[in-house]
Amino acid sequence: MAFWLPQNIQKRLLLYVLQQISLFSNIDLSNLDVSIGSKSHFSFHDVNLSLDDLNIPNVQINEGIVDELVLKLTVSGGVEIDGSGLRFIMTPLYSSGSQELHSDFLVKSIQDLTNSMLQFSDPLTTYNRYKEDDISSSDSSSDLNSNIEASKPAANGSYTLQNMRNKALNVALAKLKIALKDVTIRFIVNDRDPSDNIVEVHLESIQLITTDANLRHINIENITISSIQKQAVPDSPVHPFNNDDLSQSVYLSKMEATSLYMSAMEEQSNEDPSEPQVTQEEQENDKCKESLMEINNLNIAFKGLSSVNDLRMSNIVIDIQDVHLAIHKIVEIKNSTLKNIIDIIVTHLDANESFSCQDSQSPSPDKQEPSALSSVDIKCIYLNLGQDITVILKSFKLEQKENNSLAFSLGSFYSNSSPLTISHKTKPLLTGEQTPQSIALNMGDELDIIISHDGIAHFFKIFQFVSKCMSFYQNKSKGMMPQIASDTKRTVQLTSKAVKLSLKFPYFLLCFQVSPFIYDSNRELYIELVDVFKKLPSRCTKILTMSSITISNLQSPLQLGSYDDTLKEALIYSSVHAIIKEVIFNEEYSGIVQLVEDISAFGKLFTDSKNSECTGKSKSKRGSFLQRSVRVLNSSRFVYKQSLSANFSLKIDSMKLKVSEIIGPQFGSVEALLSNNFFAITDDSQIVYFTKNLKVERKTPSLLEPQEIMSVVLNKAVNEPVLYVHRRANGKLKVIFNNIRIHYYARWLEILKKNIGPDNASSKDEPVSQKLSKKQPTSGFPWELKCLDCSLILHPFRLKSVMVIVLDNLTTGGSSFIPQAKLLSKANTLFLIDDYQNFKIQKDKNWPSLINFYAGQGFSAIGKIDTLNFLINKSDGALLLDCKIEQVGLSLCADSFQTFCQLCIDLKYPQTFPDEEKFRTQLKNPIDVFKDIDCDLFNSAFIRENNHQNDYDSVHLVDSFLDKTHEFNNGARSKLSSQGSYEMDSSSGTATGGILLPHESYLDSAQPKEEDTPPIASKEQERDVDIRGSIDVEKVVIKLFDGYDWKYTRKFIANTVEKLDKELSKAEASSSKSNVPQSEANIFDSIYISANKNNVTDLRRNLDGEIQGVQNSFSDVSKVNLRPSKHYKALIQLNKVHVNLKNYRVDEPDESNSDNSTDVLNRCVVSIYEFEIIDNVPTSTWNKFVTLLKHEPWPHSSPMFLLDLEFIRPIDFLQAVELVMQLNVAPLRLHVDQDTLEFLIRFLGFKDKRFELIDEYPDIVFIQKFSTNSIKLRLDYKPKKVDYAGLRSGQTSELMNFFTLDGSKIILKSVVLYGLNGFDELNNKLKAIWTPDITKKQLPGVLEGLAPVRSFMAIGSGVKTLVTVLMSEYRQEGHLGRSLKKGGNVFLKTTTGDFVKLGVKLTSGTQAILENTEELFGGVGSNGRVYDASKFGSADGADSDTAAVLDLDTLFEEDQLVGSKYSRIRDHEPTAVVIDMSSPGDHNEPTIVSLYADQPLDLPTGLKEAYSSLEKHMHIAYDAVWRAKGQMKDDKRGGPSAAAVYVARAAPVAIIRPLIGATEAVSKTLQGIANQVDKTHNEQINDKYKSNRTDS
């Protein structure tokens, strides 16, 4: 039965509706009557809504237009609203302070309805009810206050009217129907920026239908959300609304049963002139409209709004058909628009959260309110990621359970597009359940995803978009969201099956297979296994395996230990920390290169985004790495550690990496094991990585054991990182190696050469500089590499020996893609071992340093390199290599010296060629040698015919030419002298004018023919230099020790001596004593040992004395000490060594393309500014073995040694290489002691067969040309023994050992040689040229240096000068008076020095003879030169001193090390050799100095030293007599015989010692006189003799 509704109530109901939709504010309804007919309705067109009366929570309405609105009222009480063309422009509100909640808005609407229907009801009652429900609003309160003042109804009738009102409203709500079409809502996100985007929501139709049982249905068709790029937004609404209230006219109308149609309003009917402009603007906006989201059908069913007292909604069921999301357009929303949207969301969430927090603080009911939502069902979701990339989600369901939990599921998730393919089998794919405490997710099937580069690019844009949203959200939500208790936070749990992700590359697929994993937000994400496969069309290989992966997202940052750039301990705080137990990687090198090239395309995405992020970051944060510090209490002191905040940290327990076929199949694979790894990404995009254990090996079937490449050296107590990598925010990459040994194997060069493919063969011959210039960016990231306490182990190609370079602190840096780098190494120690198999590591022992480690493992420390600077650069198309070294020091024995030299040669690949490739042995076409020969030339008829024509053709001598010969010779001589070269043959004596002086360099200076010209690098070739290298060494010191470093050498020599001893013993036992033969042995081509039955016992003692420098005749040596001597025997010192290298660009054509040209391959210039050889042999008294000959014309800026080498290829397509050498040597001063000479010969002649380099095709260097300047020598030679056996065999050079030379003049004349086959032939040729020249032409200069002849020649020269001066003056003046005085002065100047020097020699010789005579009679001998009273204070001291004196017989004992066949000679200036026991040394070893050393500088100094010497020796004589007197008194035997004995002991000393003092005093005086006359003499003496002053 229809419910009857009174007319007055219908009018009030209509009034309420009009008030709520704010219509008809300008329409007069005073005569309005409402009919209760079945077809009563109201129709409105083009209505502008009153904005002041429209109040929607959190939104400000700027414009509201309705094209058509129809209101229908049925007899049964139902209300139908039909509308179309609804357009709203709104601006979201950003402030939540005065905004209403949705519940407030609903209650306020009902309150307005009540007030409109019942004006006489008691407003206090309504107000109190609202007050009790905590609902208030400004609008409602103002209306209530006005109504309270207007009328006050009776209390008894208010309840009846209220029931009537509620009943009427319930009927209206039960029959409410709404149908709206073409609804458009535009949200102005930022009204301050007109150019910002506008979000438009368009609904094609909305229907609200109410069925029985209060079940309501909302059906929305075709929802579209778009983004509009608007150029200008008006500040005020387009249509200015009137403030007249339409409700007044409706309220005063008395018309009933009227069908009202209002199509126009008087004030609104006038056309607005701006309306056409708005329409045009909208049309323009539609052109730039981008659709972001589309929903084709949305159905919402719910129960609720049953009565005024019960406005709750329940059992909400949402059914959505299809949802289309344009993700690729959403991510392109402007940042300002996105930021504003996030601000609105955060503001509203903050308001709701605040309300929920206030509600939670009030007393909670016993039962929690159930959720109104019942279920959500979305049939299909289409995610459009870009062109041809669509992801489809089907059957998404959300259902509310009885226990207030929410269950949801996803049926399928797939994509069939080419850039992205997603598939699975089982449905549903994902299920889950949400409770107030937790969210549980379960993926029920394996997921297979294949994505290409385009797909990753789109996903990366989405990731960037989400990151921006999260960043905006976090920045806005700081300080706004209230703190929620930890017990209310939901935990998330995810259980997943296997996931397979494949990255699509052009030639392969990279597949990631993730095993089933579990995620718990309270704990961690755990993945058992991740495998990475590389799928090729023909095969599939596993390249990566990661096991036991744990990722923790912590609430509070985790403190982790780390290190800074200086390897000092630091702290890292990370909120996301991952742990991987093991990582295994295995792939071929070519596959890695291809993979890196393909992944680099993806890297551009990250690079571009990172550059944009870095530009927005502040400068202060860029350099904030490890700038903060944390104070940690450690025992009783504070330890400061730098700290760093990280976004992500990763710890990997073990990493096993295997890379195969790096160079080729023969090389095998390289395997690396890294333990205890740590990786972190900081807040400012810095990367930190380090590992604490590292081992890299090479494995191949050809090797029995793995070949070590890189490993940890020492087991330190403090476990520091061995590899540290740090990438700063500015892109600089820093790598540090610590406590690592790195191996270099020359064998790798052979594998590299064999595995150069045909594609690389053409580029192999390309110049290095051109290779570096290809495909180089203009700039790159800076990098730096450091090696701290590392060692570089160099393995030669053929030898078993190894050299180790210990790098204390090496730093190198440069920029990527730019051929420029700098290297600095402060201290580098060199170690050497003869066989690397002898290197046995003691793992249990802790070594303090690398030097101690290698020294304790059998290595020999051979040298040190201080402050090495190395620079690589590119200039003028050439690669520049510049090396500067401050000092190089080497300490070598004979065996280690050979090992070192051979190892340096063997560090490169021994490239040799067969003769077929070096020489053209066969000609393509035969050559007719008689082609151009006239066969009739020598016939008798031809000779007679042409005989008469040759009568006047004979050669005529030109006299003038011969006359000018002398002038030419003199001019050439003066020119050569001015240039400082000694090419003039001065040894030929005084040249007469008629003798033609040959010009040695004439052949070189003449212009030869083109085909005979030796190739020399021209200026054009200098421009074609590919590599320029220079090595500058400030100082080189090479110490040569006697003895042997290698245990093998010492053992071999000792076994040889033992074998020799056994042979002699066996021969002596088997034969008679008189017929025992002499045994000889030759060891290492440098040690000659011979012994017979008489000297077998002394053989070991002589060997030990030769090596260690001290011989003791009284000690019994059972074992030879062959270890290196305590002190070096010779020292080579080079100053300012410069090596200049040039490598030229040459083509390597084959024979068909060759032009038979000659190529200069490279050039090397070695120059030594100054060099000396110091003599430190104990038995030698001389100081400098070789030094510069002073006071000779040699340019000061010219080096003493210059060697210019050019390597030339005569024919460009053949492999034969020839050498052009040019040598220049300064004048030299030689002080040659025979013992030192034999040591150097023995040292340099040592040859061990273990270190011989044998090539497949032995090659001897062909010297195309060798040239040298004239070398002037001044020689002092002291022989000590003569090899009579060699003399008898014809070795005439042994005759030199009979003579002592002092200042002999020798000139090695300039030589130019062509066509020498090797250095052996060069040596023989030089001997054949220089030896006859010296013996035939330079004997006067050699004999001038003989000791007995030198003084007489000097006197004879003085006499000759005197006579010459007298005769010249007499011829000019006719008398001898003045000429005699002048000649006498010249005679004194030229002969005084020689007379004095002769006196010095005589007195020194006399002193030595007297000291030896005293020593034979029991005196102290030469030990008395330094007086020490303590030694003569007791009788015990005398006995010990006598025993400590080194016997001169042992001093001149034959050198058994070079053969006992050498005989002793005792008459070679023994007066110049003395023994000084006073100088301090190790174990009181004697130091041998000369009587000529430490001479006084002038006569006064000589007199002082003479007086001191005389006083010293008189004291010695006095002490000897006084000591003898004391011994006589203390002798208990007494008697004349005892007195005679003591007197006999003291008499020689008392008599001879004053004589010794007198001779020494005379010698010192004469030395002072000689140095006073000749100021340069003392400098020469210091160069020649060892000084005792420096030793003290």
From Swiss-Prot:
Deletion phenotype: Impairs the formation of autophagosomes. Completely blocks the movement of the ER-staining dye R18 from the ER to IM precursors.
Modified residue annotations for Phosphoserine: 236, 249, 1086
Pfam family membership, one: ATG2_CAD
Outcome of swapping residue 1086 to A: Does not affect autophagy
Molecular function GO terms recorded: lipid transfer activity; phosphatidylinositol-3-phosphate binding; protein-membrane adaptor activity
GO-annotated cellular components: cytoplasm; cytosol; endoplasmic reticulum membrane; extrinsic component of phagophore assembly site membrane; phagophore; phagophore assembly site; phagophore assembly site membrane; protein-containing complex
Annotated keywords: Autophagy, Coiled coil, Endoplasmic reticulum, Lipid transport, Membrane, Phosphoprotein, Protein transport, Transport
Region feature Disordered, mapped onto this chain: 264-286
Transmembrane portions of the chain: none
Coiled-coil region list: 1049-1075
Region annotated PAS-targeting domain, chain positions: 1347-1373
Keyword Membrane: yes
UniProt xrefs under InterPro entries: ATG2
Region annotation ER-targeting domain: where it falls in the sequence: 2-21
Membrane topology: Peripheral membrane protein
UniProt catalytic activity: a 1,2-diacyl-sn-glycero-3-phosphocholine(in) = a 1,2-diacyl-sn-glycero-3-phosphocholine(out); a 1,2-diacyl-sn-glycero-3-phospho-L-serine(in) = a 1,2-diacyl-sn-glycero-3-phospho-L-serine(out); a 1,2-diacyl-sn-glycero-3-phosphoethanolamine(in) = a 1,2-diacyl-sn-glycero-3-phosphoethanolamine(out)
Family classification: Belongs to the ATG2 family.
Assembly and oligomerization: Interacts with ATG18. Interacts with ATG9.
This protein's domain notes: The N-terminal region (NR) associates with the endoplasmic reticulum (ER) and is responsible for the formation of the isolation membrane at the PAS.
The protein's name in its UniProt record: Autophagy-related protein 2
Organism classification: Eukaryota, Fungi, Dikarya, Ascomycota, Saccharomycotina
